[in-house]
């Protein structure tokens, strides 16, 4: 499942109003709630905590003070995601191009097993060009798989050979029922928002004699009319926080799809792909449509890493010398282990040095095949960067797959797990939705109100650990661009060692509790720190070049 605005915590990750209203600790928005939230500083994720007093990663400072005049080379970053809009104005010059492939000739020119894979590959599409848009959640698939066998049975009824499957069934059923109830409540809430927005907008449009109501016009209203005054309060709250008719509609559609497809026990779109699904080692299936039916999430992720710097368009990505390889493996729903494994292998085999994975799920029934792909990437020196998830949960206690924890008991040394940080300071520093874990989350990175590319030459703010992961991938790409001799494990070690340390900072621990527990930031990750490219470069400069033989 995508771990940004399209994730399970969709209402947490789209804007401040919805973020505060997505769990039981927050009431539905009422007309009495007129607080206008502060706005994130422009380009804040590229700013520096010391120079700019905001917890960005220091990329602007690094380019200005440490990297001027230094030679660099391009680094390939694979984005395993929903797809990337490769025609976007801020990305079209930053794409990986497979020079061994002649475009659209129907031939696998470079003999890599994939026909016409010019900019990447799509593992959730068919040879006929059709694509999987929606899919079920893994809990739905597992519940459906075992329902007929175990429904209505107690543990005492289960044969010893079936105990493990029965345990999976119980966990999947519990998660399925919890999530259906949660998303149904969220859908009711966003429908309520839509009703309030539309009524207020119609009233104010008539009052102002205009077709489209703007924030400036709303703020300029002075009236004794209580009805108009109440509508003003509502619209000002919505518009000042970036919540428009379009974003409300998007949320309604996303939640509607989750309920319509993600939790339908009878829905299975896999026939579109046309692979032998039970053959987990199968390669070469899919098609070359790297954008797919909805590239919103993947395009946003790609822009954070690589949007062209200094072109006076939209925004600047973290990394300058980078090529984006788009690998489509994540639908609207949960990704499948077979596709994740093949996506990692494709990235490695085709030259990626960094793989960004802004997705995750609570079950991994074919974990072994993903583990083998992770170990393959490790053996080839490829760094894997993974979003920690948006459930406000302790991942030391709950599963978030894929994971660095391998079935053989070893931990992959080419893996970084990333939590999300807000632009706010003090106790509000950690994103309210971010997963955390003293042993499983390595570090935090900016992940709230990140302004980046979206399809069709657009840009928007999104939030999630989905955004924090590509910020970190961008930092890693800067290091490898200027210090190409570094290995994946060295880059990982540098990023961990050079974090901007705030271990004793008191922060609110992400939670659904009415009164969030205040803990030290150091309790939420391995490092108690924020990724920082400025400090990472200084650390990388200490590592000597390997001797030539």
Model-derived features with residue positions:
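Bacterial Sec-dependent N-terminal signal peptides
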Residues: 1-24
């Amino acid at each position: 499942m995508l771990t940004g605005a399209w994730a399970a915590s969709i209402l947490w990750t789209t804007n401040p109003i919805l973020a505060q209203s997505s769990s039981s600790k927050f009431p539905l928005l009422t007309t009495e709630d007129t607080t206008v939230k502060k706005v994130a500083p422009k380009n804040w994720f590229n700013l520096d905590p010391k120079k700019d007093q905001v917890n960005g990663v220091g990329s602007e400072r690094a380019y200005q003070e440490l990297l001027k005049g230094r030679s660099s080379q391009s680094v390939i970053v694979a984005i395993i995601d929903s797809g990337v809009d490769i025609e976007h104005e801020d990305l079209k010059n930053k794409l990986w191009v497979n020079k061994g492939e002649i475009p659209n000739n129907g031939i696998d020119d470079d003999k890599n097993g994939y026909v016409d894979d010019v900019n990447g590959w799509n593992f959730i599409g068919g040879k006929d060009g059709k694509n999987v848009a929606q899919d079920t959640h893994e809990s739905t698939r597992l519940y459906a798989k075992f329902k007929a066998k175990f429904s209505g049975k107690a543990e005492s009824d289960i044969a010893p050979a079936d105990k493990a499957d029965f345990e999976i069934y119980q966990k999947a059923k519990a998660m399925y029922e919890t999530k259906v109830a949660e998303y149904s409540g969220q859908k009711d809430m966003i429908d309520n928002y839509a009703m309030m927005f539309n009524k207020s907008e119609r009233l104010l449009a008539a009052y102002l004699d205009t077709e489209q109501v703007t924030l400036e016009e709303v703020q300029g209203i002075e009236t004794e009319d209580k009805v108009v005054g109440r509508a003003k309060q509502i619209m000002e709250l919505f518009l000042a926080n970036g919540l428009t008719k379009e974003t409300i509609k998007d949320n309604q559609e996303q939640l509607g799809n989750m309920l319509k497809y993600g939790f339908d026990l009878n829905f299975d779109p896999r026939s579109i792909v046309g692979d032998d699904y039970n053959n987990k080692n199968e390669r070469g299936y899919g098609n070359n449509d790297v954008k797919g039916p909805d590239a919103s999430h993947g395009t946003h992720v790609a822009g954070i890493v690589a949007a062209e710097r200094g072109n006076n368009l939209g925004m600047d990505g973290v990394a300058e010398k980078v090529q984006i390889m788009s690998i489509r493996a994540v639908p609207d729903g949960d990704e499948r282990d077979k596709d994740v494994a093949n996506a990692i292998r494709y990235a490695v085999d085709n030259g990626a040095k960094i793989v960004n994975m802004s997705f995750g799920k609570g079950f991994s029934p074919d974990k072994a095949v993903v583990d083998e792909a992770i170990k393959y990437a490790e053996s080839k020196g490829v760094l894997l960067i993974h979003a920690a998830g948006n459930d406000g949960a302790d991942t030391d206690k709950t599963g978030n797959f894929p994971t660095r924890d391998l079935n053989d008991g070893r931990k992959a040394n080419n893996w970084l797990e990333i939590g999300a940080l807000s632009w706010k300071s003090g106790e509000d520093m950690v994103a309210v939705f971010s997963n955390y874990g003293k042993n499983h989350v390595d570090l935090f990175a900016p992940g709230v109100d990140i302004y980046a590319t979206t399809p069709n030459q657009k840009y928007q703010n999104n939030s999630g650990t989905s955004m924090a992961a590509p910020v970190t991938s961008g930092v890693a790409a800067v290091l490898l661009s200027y210090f190409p001799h570094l290995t994946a494990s060295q880059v990982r070690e540098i990023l961990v060692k050079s974090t901007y340390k705030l271990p004793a900072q008191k922060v609110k621990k992400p939670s659904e509790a009415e009164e969030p527990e205040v803990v030290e930031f150091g309790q939420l990750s391995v490092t108690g720190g924020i990724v920082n490219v400025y400090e990472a470069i200084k650390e990388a400069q200490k590592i000597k070049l390997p001797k030539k033989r």
